Amino acid sequence: MDTRFWGPSGWRLLHLIATAPPRRQTRAFFELLPYVLPCKYCRSSLADYYAVDAVPSTNFAPWLYRIHNRVNGKLRDQKLLKTPNPPWSTVKAEYEALFKAPCTRNAMIGWDFLYSVVYTTPCKAVPSEPLPDAPPSETLTTPELRNRWNTMEREERIQFIGRWWDLLPQVLPYASWRTAFASGPKRPSLTEGHKAVTEWLFQVEQRVCRALHVAANHTSFGGLCRKLSVFQSKCGSKKTRKTKTCRSSVAKGDIGKVKQTRRKSAFFNST
C-alpha cells in the first residue's frame, strides 16, 4: 500500500497509543509492528531500527519519537521528505495536548492505516518475494531474519498479524475506543483472505462510530474497496535496491485529497 496513504494515519494513532498511560499489552503490540506494516520495505527497515533501539518495557513515547526520526531520515535520503524533525519537547507537548483534548476521544483515528493492514493480509496466490540481496534461505533461521528479508511463508506471517489484531483493542488510548472496538464482530481467520478481513474491519468501524456518536468515514464497503485499490502499490516489484518505499502510481489529485487534512509537521506528514 502507498505509504503516503497510510503513513500519517498510522503515525498519529501509534504516537497517541505511546503517549497514553501504558497498558500491560502495549510492549507486545509494538514488538509485533515490524511483522504487520503494509509495505515490505517498511517492515524490513523497522526490523533494522528495532535491532538498535528495542521496544522498552515502559515510557514508549520518546522511544517511538526516536524510531520515527529514523524513518524520516530514510525518507530524506530518498529525497521523499524535506521537513526537519521537530524537537522532542514539541512532539511531546503536541501529543500530550492531543491526548487530553476532549474532542480527540470522541472519534477514533487511524482507520486508513488499519485498513491498509487488512487489505495487505497475505494471500495464498501471492508468495513473498525476497528483498534484493537476501541471504540464502537456510541461513534465515529466526522469524526476525525471515521478516527482515521478506521470506516468511504466509502461514507464519499471519500468526504474527493475528496476534497484533488481538492486542489492538486492548492498547487503544481511550476506554471508549477499547470498549467499542471489542464489541464489534469477531475477526475472521486471516486464512480467509484480505476481503473477508477488510469487510470485518468495515463492520467494526461502523460499530465504533455508532458507539462514539460520530459519522463513519466510509459508508459503503464497495466504496471503501475502490478507495483502497487506488492506493494499492506493487511495493517495489522491480529488483533494485533503489526502491525502498512502497508507492503507487496514484494520481496526484488523489494524494492531494489525502494530504488536505494533515498538519505541516514531520510528525504528522511523514510516511
Go through each PLM region and give its residues:
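Mid-to-C-terminal functional-domain signal that highlights helix-capping/loop sites
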Residues: M1-V36, K40-T271
